[in-house]
Amino acid sequence: MIRNIGSNLMKSSSSILLRNQQQQTNKLLFRNFTSIPEAVAVTSEESYNSKNQFTPIGKDSFAVVHISGKQYKVIEGDIIMTDKIQVDVGEHIVLDKVLLVGTKNETIIGKPIISNFKVHAYIEEQAKTEHVTIFKHKPRKNYKRTTGFQGLATYIRIGGIIKGQETTTTTN
């Protein structure tokens, strides 16, 4: 029995070429959509300290803060849910681990923390999270276990992003 292998080989190679061309065009489209606009300036903390022109206080500024091992992007007026923090409801807290601050025009990136920006926040609620049901089973062994979990959470309202004085230490 003789088969015509050459035509199948040509079909598969042409489909591979077509697929490669599609992947290349998809990469080009992806690059166009994910490129950083030229109007946005990314600034490190060192160059910011030399310029001292950046004041992102207001509704249009955002910050990335570090709270109990996780990072959150916050804007003034946001309510975020974090893991339980041992603080009473209604208390004012200051988040001083600010990793990034930015507006539409400029961004400051800390290495790793920006020392002279702080985020003021208020504890809104201490509550339990949504119930998660965990079901384990082993097929054909009549083994079924159902357990559940409900974690504790803290809801925090962001008051504002404040530019503070630079912290300098003096030694005597």
From Swiss-Prot:
It holds the Pfam family Ribosomal_L21p. One of its GO terms (biological process) is translation. Keywords: Mitochondrion, Ribonucleoprotein, Ribosomal protein, Transit peptide. Residues 1-20 form a transit peptide. The keyword Ribonucleoprotein applies. It is found in: Mitochondrion. InterPro entries: bL21-like (IPR028909), bL21-like_sf (IPR036164), Ribosomal_bL21 (IPR001787). NCBIfam families: L21. HAMAP family: Ribosomal_bL21 (MF_01363). Belongs to the bacterial ribosomal protein bL21 family. This is Large ribosomal subunit protein bL21m. It comes from Dictyostelium discoideum. The gene is mrpl21.
